């Protein structure tokens, strides 16, 4: 069989790639459910690793074929409702962009699962984790290949479910259960609003494939108000999936789950929501209000997430808020019709953030501590982890020549022509991110060893090897971006722009290096400064605001509804029952037991009824 035939077959059967992940979940179920308890407990882990590797290799072959021969659509007819003028197909878009995103997902999933093999070495529920990881991978792979909005919505719902299950992995801890519930409910808000938009579009467009939706959007006859409401409903789902303001709290809650799952959430799960948003943009651009909302949300998330991250002491939360900030930049690029820039930013961010998450996961594994004020001196004891953190941080903060430098340069150049103010947000975010990562590095890896780090040692090879692989990937990110580059060239910006981007990163690095830490940023005695510190540390009191507004409103409405149901509905029914019982009791006491009395009562009643009837007739 020739190579060209193999490549062609790999593309024809590309629809199998999402199924690989679900197959990994299925083969893990006998161990995850306890049907097999004692025999080879690591077998499901090895099976899932093999399946993820097969998915990655299959995607690589398909990508080579598509780059040579062009994209095509794989379509399986599913449901045709001619009376309702609605046709639903299982449709996959096998394009270079989608396959590149698929390779990112399957590759990072494989590396994260290999990392989990060492991180969860002593975990009794290892099979359950790998079953959920397979489910996770299958849903994400389906989202990026999907060419149908209905199909994408269904797969996004699967992502929400898998997030709930993975965050609640250690369900014996009450805090974990609460975090899983809060993360699920927060994402459900966006999912329900997206469902409203999907249902509305199914009635308007007559088909749910994106090409059908684009054709309908060009002929859109809806009123401006209806178009705006539809657009706001459609963006709600991606806002929740990408952890954007005001639905960003779930990513912070999700940090209660195992760190290998956090690697995927911080890197590729949020990417899936952004990809769905990009596919919806030809529809959303018909509403200027929707675009303005996207820009506002992206700006608030980028600046707010960056500011909040520098006030956190939980090492995992310093990265989760940084993820919110970078996805805010992606939202700005998408709203300003720069999808290629958004894709490159997602690509560079995902690889660097995955490596950062692995490095801090290694720190947590050896110290059993997430509070950076209790860590220190790990640089000399964990050289591989330290190197991974440094390279990942440099790749994320736009330092030449690593990946995000080229993304920020392109962002400054392309967005600066349209809206210079939004281009400045890229620089501010880069500066604050560099400040945050430098602060964490000084706190964790430099200084004297703390009690929890004095006996720390480098992690095992199963955790170190994935970090080394990703370290190389971060270093090669510019080369990979050039290969899949949908723009004229990743270096197609002026030297002044490049110097500006590099300077913004160096400014943040310098501030982070000179600011006094003293093992913690102590609360200032100056009241205004203390207020700012608390404002950032508590995420602008977003959760308290929700509690005082939405939660209290819903609780009040629930109380009123409960009172109405208890006092009015149940009260009326109970009153009728009590009245019947009391009437029967009174009637029982009035009975004499004589037949003459019964006959007389019946006769009187009949006479009364006849008299009333004759009166009514007359």
Swiss-Prot record:
It comes from the Eukaryota. It catalyses: a plastoquinone + NADH + (n+1) H(+)(in) = a plastoquinol + NAD(+) + n H(+)(out); a plastoquinone + NADPH + (n+1) H(+)(in) = a plastoquinol + NADP(+) + n H(+)(out). NDH is composed of at least 16 different subunits, 5 of which are encoded in the nucleus. Belongs to the complex I subunit 5 family. Signal peptide: none annotated. The keyword NAD applies. It comes from Paulinella chromatophora. This is NAD(P)H-quinone oxidoreductase subunit 5, organellar chromatophore 2.
């Amino acid at each position: 069989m020739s190579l060209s035939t193999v490549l062609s077959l790999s593309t024809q059967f590309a629809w199998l790639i999402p199924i690989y992940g679900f197959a990994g979940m299925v083969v893990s179920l006998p161990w995850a459910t306890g049907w097999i308890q004692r025999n080879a407990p690591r077998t499901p882990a090895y099976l899932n690793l093999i399946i993820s590797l097969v998915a990655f290799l299959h995607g690589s072959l398909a990508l080579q074929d598509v780059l040579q021969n062009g994209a095509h659509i794989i379509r399986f007819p599913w449901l045709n409702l001619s009376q309702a003028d609605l046709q639903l197909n299982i449709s996959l878009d096998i394009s270079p962009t989608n396959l590149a995103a698929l390779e990112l997902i399957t590759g990072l999933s494989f590396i994260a699962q290999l990392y989990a093999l060492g991180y969860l070495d002593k975990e009794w529920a290892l099979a359950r984790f790998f079953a959920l990881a397979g489910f996770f991978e299958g849903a994400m792979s389906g989202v990026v290949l999907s060419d149908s909005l209905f199909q994408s919505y269904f797969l996004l719902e699967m992502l929400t479910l898998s997030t709930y299950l993975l965050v609640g992995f250690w369900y014996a801890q009450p805090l974990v259960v609460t975090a899983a519930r809060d993360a699920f409910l927060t994402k459900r808000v966006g999912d329900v609003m997206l469902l409203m938009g999907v249902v509305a579009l199914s009635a308007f467009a007559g088909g749910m494939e994106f090409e059908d939706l684009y054709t309908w959007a060009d002929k859109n006859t809806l009123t401006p108000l209806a178009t705006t409401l539809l657009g706001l409903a459609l963006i709600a789902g991606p806002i929740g999936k990408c952890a954007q303001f005001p639905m960003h709290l779930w990513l912070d809650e999700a940090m209660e789950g195992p760190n290998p799952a956090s690697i995927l959430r911080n890197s590729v799960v949020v990417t899936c929501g952004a990809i769905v948003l990009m596919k919806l943009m030809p529809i959303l651009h018909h509403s200027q209000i929707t675009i303005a909302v996207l820009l506002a949300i992206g700006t608030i998330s980028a600046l707010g997430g960056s500011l909040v991250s520098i006030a956190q002491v939980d090492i995992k939360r310093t990265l989760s808020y940084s993820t919110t900030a970078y996805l805010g930049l992606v939202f700005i690029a998408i709203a300003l019709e720069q999808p290629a820039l958004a894709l490159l930013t997602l690509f560079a961010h995902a690889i660097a953030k995955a490596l950062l998450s692995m490095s801090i996961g290694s720190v947590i594994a050896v110290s059993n501590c997430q509070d950076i004020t209790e860590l220190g001196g790990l640089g000399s004891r964990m050289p591989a982890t330290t190197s991974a953190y440094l390279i990942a941080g440099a790749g994320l903060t736009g330092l030449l020549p690593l990946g995000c430098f080229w993304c920020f340069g392109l962002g400054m150049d392309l967005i600066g022509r349209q809206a210079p103010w939004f281009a400045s947000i890229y620089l501010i975010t880069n500066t604050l991110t560099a400040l945050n990562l430098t602060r964490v590095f000084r706190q964790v890896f430099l200084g004297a060893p703390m009690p929890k780090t004095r006996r720390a040692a480098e992690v095992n090879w199963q955790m170190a090897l994935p970090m080394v692989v990703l370290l190389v990937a971060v270093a090669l990110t510019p080369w990979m971006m050039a290969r899949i580059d949908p723009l004229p060239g990743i270096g197609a910006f002026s030297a002044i722009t490049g110097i500006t981007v590099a300077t913004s990163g160096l400014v943040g690095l310098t501030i982070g290096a000179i600011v006094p830490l003293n093992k913690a940023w102590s609360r200032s005695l100056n009241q205004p400064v203390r207020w700012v510190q608390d404002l950032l540390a508590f995420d602008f009191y977003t959760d308290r605001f929700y509690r005082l507004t939405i939660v209290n409103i819903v609780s009040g409405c629930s109380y009123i509804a409960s009172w109405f149901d208890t006092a009015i509905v149940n009260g009326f029914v109970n009153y009728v029952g009590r009245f019947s019982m009391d009437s029967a009791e009174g009637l029982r006491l009035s009975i004499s037991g004589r037949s003459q009395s019964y006959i007389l009562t019946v006769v009187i009643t009949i006479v009364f009824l006849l008299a009333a009837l004759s009166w009514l007739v007359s």
